Amino acid sequence: MGANVLIMAGGTGGHVFPALACAREFQNRGYTVHWLGTPRGIENELVPNAGLPLHLINVTGLRGKGKLSLLKAPFVLLKAVWQARKVIRDVQPVCVLGFGGYVTGPGGVAAKLAGVPVIVHEQNAVAGTANRLLVPLAARVCEAFPNTFSASDKRRTTGNPVRTELFMDIARQALAGRKAHLLILGGSLGAEPLNKLLPEAVAQLPAELRPEIFHQAGKNHDEVTATRYREAGVEANVQPFIKDMAHAYGWADLVVCRAGALTVSELAAAGLPSLLVPLPHAIDDHQTRNAEYLAGEGAAFLLPQRTTGAADLAARLTEVLMQPERLNSMASTASRLAKPDATRTVVDICLEVAHG
């Protein structure tokens, strides 16, 4: 293999999955990828499974912590920077690419001190704290959504790296003569409100308008959600997880889900209209901002959880399911917003910076 690249991403799948997509692209171009993470994040499972060397530093978030933790914070951060600096010295990367999470701050500072160029990628419409703080140190800042960062020569709007199979042409059946297909992605984080809301809402639809339902309820939520559908007199296929998301997106005509950065990007990639119910307690309310992007362009409807009851959701479902041409228009708009070259673009930017 060729030169080394260091990727920094940790904590949640929202940071790690797009980073893994870029890791594969680097490997396809002959680079060796190393990963900087923390001991408690999802990267500890996903990165070794991908066959990538994982280097760990000890750092946690500071928001909402007590006074003692805040007093210790400078020493914790200094130690984390020192640990990251040792990794960089050992790996000797030509560039460092950060996707957010607690690891990104100390790792980015260590890279800058070592004279290694730093590139930042922000997945959400609102930049996370670590990425915001790294902007002055970064050679380039990549954003998934337009205008996440202030205008500068460093900024590039790239989109989010997502799984390539979602961009394959999907031959959906025409809605005429069949029931619509409704995909519900409850997930695991904040799943219960959607799992409770959907059976009640669909039960209020006229029988002739009720769609076929495929509902991902999340681990340990599937049985109670299936019971809710049965008690409401609604047929539904309820599963804890969906292993083949590309197939599920290809089946669907409409999606009801949260508005995480990757979900929003995948909806665009799959060309799917959606009803988005942002997680209300997400940091910086970034899910609402993500949803506003698709809704503002006409590819989705934004339904705030606090003000959306079963009757409200039923009314919106009725509105869109009775207008197949509107669903088609929303789907076309979603496809237009997709950025199928996001992974290649981010890697191109990194290598341009690394090699001049």
Curated annotation (Swiss-Prot):
It comes from the Bacteria. Pathway: Cell wall biogenesis; peptidoglycan biosynthesis. GO terms for biological process: carbohydrate metabolic process; cell division; cell wall organization; lipid glycosylation; peptidoglycan biosynthetic process; regulation of cell shape. Keywords: Cell cycle, Cell division, Cell inner membrane, Cell membrane, Cell shape, Cell wall biogenesis/degradation, Glycosyltransferase, Membrane, Peptidoglycan synthesis, Transferase. Its EC number is 2.4.1.227. CDD domains: GT28_MurG. UDP-N-acetyl-alpha-D-glucosamine binds at T12, G13, G14, N124, R163, S188, I242, A261, L262, T263, V264, S265, E266, Q287. It is a peripheral membrane protein. It is found in: Cell inner membrane. It catalyses: di-trans,octa-cis-undecaprenyl diphospho-N-acetyl-alpha-D-muramoyl-L-alanyl-D-glutamyl-meso-2,6-diaminopimeloyl-D-alanyl-D-alanine + UDP-N-acetyl-alpha-D-glucosamine = di-trans,octa-cis-undecaprenyl diphospho-[N-acetyl-alpha-D-glucosaminyl-(1->4)]-N-acetyl-alpha-D-muramoyl-L-alanyl-D-glutamyl-meso-2,6-diaminopimeloyl-D-alanyl-D-alanine + UDP + H(+). GO terms for cellular component: plasma membrane. It is an enzyme of class 2 (transferase). GO terms for molecular function: UDP-N-acetyl-D-glucosamine:N-acetylmuramoyl-L-alanyl-D-glutamyl-meso-2,6-diaminopimelyl-D-alanyl-D-alanine-diphosphoundecaprenol 4-beta-N-acetylglucosaminlytransferase activity; undecaprenyldiphospho-muramoylpentapeptide beta-N-acetylglucosaminyltransferase activity. Its main location: membrane. SUPFAM superfamilies: UDP-Glycosyltransferase/glycogen phosphorylase. Cell wall formation. Catalyzes the transfer of a GlcNAc subunit on undecaprenyl-pyrophosphoryl-MurNAc-pentapeptide (lipid intermediate I) to form undecaprenyl-pyrophosphoryl-MurNAc-(pentapeptide)GlcNAc (lipid intermediate II). Belongs to the glycosyltransferase 28 family. MurG subfamily. PANTHER family: GLYCOSYLTRANSFERASE, UDP-N-ACETYLGLUCOSAMINE--N-ACETYLMURAMYL-(PENTAPEPTIDE) PYROPHOSPHORYL-UNDECAPRENOL N-ACETYLGLUCOSAMINE TRANSFERASE 1. This is UDP-N-acetylglucosamine--N-acetylmuramyl-(pentapeptide) pyrophosphoryl-undecaprenol N-acetylglucosamine transferase. It comes from Pseudomonas fluorescens (strain SBW25). The gene is murG.
